[in-house]
């Protein structure tokens, strides 16, 4: 499932983000609660999570049983974990996201996700 759309930041390096958009770069990476996606023509985090959950629900409606592998990116996955754990979606820190190739296993029962194990 797709990552958050980062608007004018798409394709930029971290250095370029901080050079061209220092205030929003600082907010996103160090104070995400004050990040204003509209300032960089990006998808806001709430909309990204809603889009992700819509995709997950579509998959669950098609595949009523068995195992499902979902491959996605760190930011949207971190927001999903916060959603499952009833934490704020803004409790993310880009500097501590799961690494490439990391995974978590969830079960889904009675309309709820439960983390089973991680690597």
Regions found by a protein language model. Name each.
Residues 116-119:
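Short, solvent-exposed aromatic-acidic interface loops
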Residues 25-47:
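Short glycine/proline- and acidic residue-enriched helix-loop micro-motifs
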Residues 3-4, 76-78:
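Short, active-site-adjacent cap segments at secondary-structure transitions
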Residues 1-26, 95:
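Phosphate-coordination/substrate-recognition cap region in phosphate-metabolizing enzymes
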Residues 58, 62, 83-87:
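Active-site catalytic microenvironments for nucleophilic, acid-base chemistry
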Residues 85-114:
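Domain-level recognition of soluble alpha/beta enzyme cores
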Residues 59, 64-75:
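Generic beta-sheet signal
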Residues 17, 48-49:
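Conserved anionic group-binding/transfer micro-motifs
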């Amino acid at each position: 499932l797709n990552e958050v759309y980062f608007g004018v930041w798409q394709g930029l390096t971290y250095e370029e983000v901080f050079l061209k958009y220092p205030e929003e770069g600082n907010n996103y990476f160090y104070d995400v609660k004050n990040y204003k996606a509209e300032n960089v023509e990006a998808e806001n985090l709430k909309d990204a999570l809603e889009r992700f959950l819509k995709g997950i629900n579509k998959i669950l409606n098609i595949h009523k049983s068995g195992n499902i592998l979902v491959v996605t990116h760190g930011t949207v996955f971190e927001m999903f974990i916060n959603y499952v754990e009833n934490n704020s979606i803004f409790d993310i820190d880009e500097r501590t996201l799961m690494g490439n190739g990391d995974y978590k296993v969830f079960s889904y029962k009675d309309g709820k996700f439960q983390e089973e194990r991680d690597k």
